[in-house]
């Protein structure tokens, strides 16, 4: 199984590691699996599909409809990371068709939960509060992500490994759409702070507007369903984990914030 990925913050100015890890790395793995006739599962991202319009029915959103990504959505990556992930997906598909590689692919929405690197949006804001740093909201905070707890992602991958049809792509999501502004305000509320105690910083370059997953194929064909469907509770549990495991993230914090500061974030 391939879950390879690289943290984005340090690589904005040098995208080559994306190419080497996601393309060359995937090639090495699928060639080894082909040679030794090993079952392979490729973990990918919904970012390969680009982004979707903002929805009218979410607070502060635009004029878009509630469309979602499916396995039939054309690839339209918009960043060095997502373009190389799309390339790695296509390598796997080609090896399945050309060489009979026994493989499946999953494309998942944004994860949250314990052990997530503090560069990422949710743990960054949690550890900012814990470190006495003002949380940072990128741009206006309208960007929407379809959040899924890491335990649900793991259970979905296991379901695909044990029940999935070879050659198929399954999208993993938990119907957890929230905009960044709502998420940061909820974090502050759950941590006993004023929900407006954050500052706006520069938006990310090429920041995709909205991701949303249609996971009906995974649910209907393989019988999977998410267990962590209460985002508020899942976020509270995640906050508690970072509170209780400061030694895991504390040494990284200064470097992460210094790197963000270079980009005005």
Locate the predicted segments by residue.
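N-terminal Rossmann-like NAD(P)+-binding domain of SDR-like oxidoreductases, especially those catalyzing
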Residues: 1-111, 236-245, 251, 255-265
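Glycine-rich, flexible loop/turn motifs
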Residues: 8, 14, 65, 71, ...
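Residues at alpha-helix caps and immediate loop-helix transition turns in enzyme cores, especially N-
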Residues: 14, 25, 117-121, 183, ...
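Residues in soluble alpha-helical coiled-coils and helical-bundle/repeat scaffolds
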Residues: 20, 113-117, 226
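Structural element of the ATP-grasp superfamily
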Residues: 29, 92, 125, 218-219
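NAD(P)-dependent short-chain dehydrogenase/reductase
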Residues: 52-68, 90-162, 175-177, 184-191
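Conserved donor sugar-nucleotide recognition element shared by glycan-biosynthetic enzymes
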Residues: 80, 88, 118, 180, ...
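C-terminal substrate-binding subdomain of Rossmann-fold SDR/epimerase-dehydratase oxidoreductases
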Residues: 129-265
């Amino acid at each position: 199984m391939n879950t390879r990925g690289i943290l984005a913050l340090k690589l904005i100015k040098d995208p080559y590691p994306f190419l080497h890890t996601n393309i060359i790395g995937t090639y090495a793995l699928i060639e080894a699996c082909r040679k030794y006739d090993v079952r392979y599962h490729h973990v990918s991202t919904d970012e390969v599909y680009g982004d979707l319009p903002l929805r009218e029915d979410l607070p502060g959103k635009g004029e878009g409809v509630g469309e979602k990504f499916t396995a039939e959505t054309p690839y339209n990556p918009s960043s060095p990371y997502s373009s190389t992930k799309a390339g790695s997906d296509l390598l796997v598909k080609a090896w399945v068709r050309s060489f009979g590689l026994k493989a499946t692919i999953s494309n998942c929405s944004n994860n949250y939960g314990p052990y997530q690197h503090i560069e990422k949006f949710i743990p960054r804001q949690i550890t900012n509060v814990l470190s006495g740093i003002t949380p940072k909201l990128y741009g206006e905070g309208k960007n929407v992500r379809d959040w899924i707890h890491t335990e649900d992602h793991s259970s979905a991958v296991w379901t695909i490994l044990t029940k999935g049809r070879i050659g198929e792509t399954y999208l993993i999501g938990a119907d957890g759409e929230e905009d960044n502004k709502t998420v940061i305000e909820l974090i502050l509320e759950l941590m006993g702070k004023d929900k407006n105690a954050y500052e706006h910083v520069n938006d990310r370059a090429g920041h995709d507007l909205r991701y949303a997953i249609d996971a009906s194929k995974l649910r209907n064909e393989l019988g999977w369903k998410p267990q962590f469907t209460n985002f508020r509770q899942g976020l509270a549990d995640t906050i508690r984990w970072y509170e209780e495991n400061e030694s895991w993230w504390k040494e990284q914090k200064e470097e992460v914030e210094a790197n963000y500061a270079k980009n005005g974030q």
